[in-house]
Amino acid sequence: MDRIATWDDYRRRVEDLQRELLTLPAGAPIRLRKGQETSNLFRPRRCEHTAFDADGFTGTLSIDRTQRHADVLGMTTYEDLVAATLPFGLAPLVVPQLKTITLGGAVTGLGIESASFRNGCPHESVLEMDILTGDGRVLTAAPNNEYRDLFFGFPNSYGTLGYALRLRIELEPVAPYVHLRHLRFGSVSECAVAIEAICNQREWDGERVDFIDGTWFSASECYLTVGAYADTAPTVSNYTGQQIYYRSIRSRTDDWLTTHDYFWRWDTDWFWCSRAFGAQNAVIRRMWPARYRRSDVYWKLIALERRYGIKRWIDRRRGEPDREEVIQDVEVPVDRLADFIDFLDRRTGIQPVWMCPLKQRDPAATWDLYPLDPATLYVNVGFWSTAALPAGEQDGYHNRAIEEKVAQLGGRKSLYSTAFYPEDEFWATYGGPTYELLKKAYDGEERLLDLYAKTVQRR
């Protein structure tokens, strides 16, 4: 499918897509067909649905430098979106960590990054969306129009109410460089106190803070990385070659990156997960072409392992215990961060762990399917690994315990990966009554899966 380049192209493609939907069997469940290179979901799923093609909805239709907003198509990756906006000295308010996350995916499935302590999640800087609903309409949803219920109910719906074809998003001015400071703390408790102070004051040691995230390596080694835009840099590091970004956190106190490289600092090694493929071995790394050191390549390797189970077969031959994938992002209140990481460490032994503060941008907004307390500073905790299963236990042993702990601490869990909630608890957590009303209004014949079927039952 050719990329859409103009508004006229976009309107024609919308009409084509609506006609395509009319040709699909009546009553048959439908699903968006998209390439693996733009999928960042970590839940295996059974394919039982008729797919329709929206791959052509990629590209940036317009950038308004005066009003600082852009009209962007829903299947556009953040890699392409940033490439379009940076030449104008502008960027989305939140740029998720991985290049192939799409704008539409980040809005319907949530996203986060180190600007989230001041800008919230990507959906909070959306001005309006054209949404293809399950009943075949294309509706422009905005916070103050007749489809405001769809606008505020769309985040965390994961394509079960419809698909965003076009989004108008806010942009903010950026500088050419980012100055990083890596701050070490001896415990998560100390780190949590610093997170709260930095996010409230938006500075550290007299310097402005535009970005903040953290890396927990062990019970006695925890870092916060604070970043500030800079017009100049005395030197610039490059972590797309032999050097590995997350290792630099432990060895450097100051660093400078171009803004482009800062946005993608985690992508080259998929945070630290490239080690599972040998990409952090110096010899292998030299032979591994730089263009293939990126998150979507590692994702494809994961998909191959899931399909053929080679590593699991080898582990069993060696007599090693079965392991459960524990790939999750959760939000917990900052004052419960130490409790959660202590639990996670004792339960799974997963190290390192990523930490990213988050606060709702507009305290007056209500995002129905993923409600957060607007007065609370949360910390997103990201952990992407495996944990040994006790003899006789099945998948879900660790992940279900994590879900229960997050609920106990007053947090929330993102649904991009596996979930094991009982149905009643799920709907109580993720806006069940509101979701039911939205489903009736915009997908009355249930052509799209419901949220529980898609995220927990993996259909």
Language model segments and positions:
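Noncatalytic alpha-helical scaffold of FAD-dependent oxidoreductases
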Residues: 1-459
